[in-house]
């Protein structure tokens, strides 16, 4: 079955849609996460996720390109350990429809096949 999503690196072009989605999803996210909901916060998040040990990916619907959520691979340690952490959140109204599950499956493949990690927590 063809994936319903595409993973793309977070970029400055995502700012307007990301902020709108974060604002629309406040009730969904509170109190667990607080995605960037202002231009200044988005720019700071993008700068942090642009560091070599940080990676942020948007999860987008393949059919409409709508922003579904975000998945991160962070605190990447290379060398013998080759380890990282992952985090994710969906945006309303896409939560609960399986898009993030597909995104996580794709990010795990990326982490182990492309990044050659040994461990993902």
Locate the predicted segments by residue.
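GNAT-family acyltransferases
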Residues: 1-93
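Conserved GNAT acetyl-CoA-binding A-motif
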Residues: 114-121
